[in-house]
Curated annotation (Swiss-Prot):
Deletion consequences: Mutant mice show hypopigmentation of the coat and have the retinal pigmented epithelium significantly less pigmented than wild-type retinas.
Gene: Dct
The protein's name in its UniProt record: L-dopachrome tautomerase
Taxonomy of the source species: Eukaryota, Metazoa, Chordata, Craniata, Vertebrata
Signal peptide location: 1-23
Entry comment on modification after translation: Glycosylated.
Pfam families (alphabetical): Tyrosinase (PF00264)
């Protein structure tokens, strides 16, 4: 069997229903004792007493802090979902790292920092338009995605049951599974949007921790940063950066859906990916939401069929335009009450695509991010499965670029983000679900540069060409001249009807020239 064949085999095994102890929780913490004690504070290195790197001054084991402020929105239950007060249903003590140290055992650095002591600012990586990549850069990106699909995550596992069933039927076996790096990226997104499980066939659907609220921008930002760092590790290239797809073309075509990039449509079945693309063999995970709800279980990483896109019968739908992006960026308010999908004149809601790009609400309209997903259709059209499609990565990279442009233009204070009464998961200090160790929305409400990356993109107003400006001026002058001629003709007509009257009386008069004669 060749190298690729072994890679595919490992990829298939990587997300099976394997009850084995980075992704949702560190593998080292998902033991019977770890789950029962609700503590995830592993040692750093071989010294067992070096808990959270404490002996090196990197961190210590501490009580998890969660947001206790009230939320609003359609989720009205309490203590029914294991994502409430994340992650305390699973762990109430974790490593709290000091300074720029980060990670489940404080063994890494925060985004944007490097060095043994994490005290050296890392040169910012540059996210560029995917169409501007060289052939070598393009191959590195596509190859890294494929490698991530086939590589079991070395540190993290996923849970295959909700919190009440986490230890299995006999209460002694943690219900977990190994998963590939990319499939875990998919699983994170699924877990953030999945329904609350109340019983067989009784899902509570009014909940979403990564959409329909302020956390939409920060959640997806962290999601991409997580994947970018994993791809850097897989490729051994610390300067590796995710590209973006500028979907604001206003066209009726997906210009990244080619065999040179993320896969064209298959000729004999246009809902599938062309056999000339490496993505034609990608199988998807976490797609059978109704089945999970019926069985009161979670996505366990089993493959559920091939990746699909579906443009059939959608020939009149067009992608957003640059004007839509510019209108969205002109909105100065980050978000507005009720901080939900019906917020108006909210930059976040316009970017997410529930508002028109200018911030007005129209329930019949999809725009920007939502429109791009709808345009691709297929696997990409549903939140729980969308991240299976690699187009998701470059689509959200551009969405993040728009968010970053807004941050740079407006320089908002943290007070721009609601402390309370946003939907569950969307308050400023809520720990984003299901990232671990815990990270709040506020921690990602920063410019990209502060997090170690930048975008090579120009989202400013396009300057009109000289001939266009000149033509506009000439048309304006001609229009004013025609209007003046019409006004003079009207005045002459009235004067002839009333008879001659002097323009100015010789006597004093209180009548003003704006009044009727």
């Amino acid at each position: 069997m060749g190298l690729v064949g072994w890679g595919l085999l490992l990829g298939c095994l990587g997300c099976g229903i394997l009850l084995r102890a980075r992704a949702q929780f560190p593998r080292v913490c998902m033991t019977l004792d770890g789950v029962l004690n609700k503590e995830c504070c592993p040692p750093l290195g071989p010294e067992a007493t070096n808990i959270c790197g404490f002996l090196e001054g990197r961190g210590q084991c501490a009580e998890v802090q969660t947001d206790t402020r009230p939320w609003s929105g359609p989720y009205i239950l309490r203590n029914q979902d294991d994502r409430e007060q994340w992650p305390r249903k699973f762990f109430n003590r974790t490593c709290k790292c000091t300074g720029n140290f980060a990670g489940y055992n404080c063994g890494g650095c925060k985004f944007g920092w490097t060095g043994p002591d994490c005290n050296r600012k890392k040169p910012a990586i540059l996210r560029r338009n995917i169409h501007s990549l060289t052939a070598q850069e393009r191959e590195q990106f596509l190859g890294a995605l494929d490698l991530a699909k086939k590589s079991i995550h070395p540190d993290y596992v996923i849970t295959t049951q909700h919190w009440l069933g986490l230890l299995g039927p006999n209460g002694t076996q943690p219900q977990i599974a190994n998963c590939s790096v990319y499939d875990f990226f998919v699983w994170l997104h699924y877990y953030s949007v999945r329904d609350t499980l109340l019983g067989p066939g009784r899902p509570y659907k009014a909940i979403d921790f990564s959409h329909q609220g302020p956390a939409f921008v920060t959640w997806h930002r962290y999601h991409l940063l997580w994947l970018e760092r994993e791809l850097q590790r897989l490729t051994g290239n610390e300067s590796f950066a995710l590209p973006y797809w500028n979907f604001a073309t206003g066209k009726n075509e997906c210009d990244v859906c080619t065999d040179e990039l993320l896969g064209a449509a298959r000729q004999d079945d246009p809902t599938l990916i062309s056999r000339n693309s490496r993505f034609s063999t990608w199988e998807i995970v976490c797609d059978s939401l109704d089945d999970y709800n019926r069985r009161v279980t979670l996505c366990n990483g089993t493959y559920e069929g091939l990746l699909r896109r579906n443009k059939v019968g959608r020939n009149n739908e067009k992608l957003p335009t640059l004007k839509n992006v510019q209108d969205c960026l002109s909105l100065q308010k980050f978000d507005s009450p009720p901080f939900f999908q019906n917020s108006t004149f909210s930059f976040r809601n316009a970017l997410e695509g529930f508002d028109k790009a200018d911030g007005t609400l129209d329930s019949q309209v999809m725009n920007l991010h939502n429109l791009a997903h709808s345009f691709l259709n297929g696997t990409n059209a549903l939140p729980h499965s969308a991240a299976n499609d690699p187009v998701f990565v470059v689509l959200h990279s551009f969405t993040d670029a728009i968010f970053d442009e807004w941050l740079k233009r407006n320089n908002p204070s943290t007070d721009a983000w609601p402390q309370e009464l946003a939907p569950i998961g969307h308050n400023r200090m809520y720990n984003m679900v299901p990232f671990f160790p815990p990270v709040t929305n506020e921690e990602l409400f920063l410019t990209a540069e502060q997090l170690g990356y930048n975008y090579a993109v120009d989202l400013s107003e396009e300057e009109a060409p000289v001939w266009s400006t000149t033509l506009s001026v000439v048309i304006g002058i001609l229009g004013a001249f025609v209007l003046l001629l019409g006004l003079l003709a009207f005045l002459q007509y009235r004067r002839l009807r009333k008879g001659y009257a002097p323009l100015m009386e010789t006597g004093l008069s209180s009548k003003r020239y704006t009044e009727e004669a």
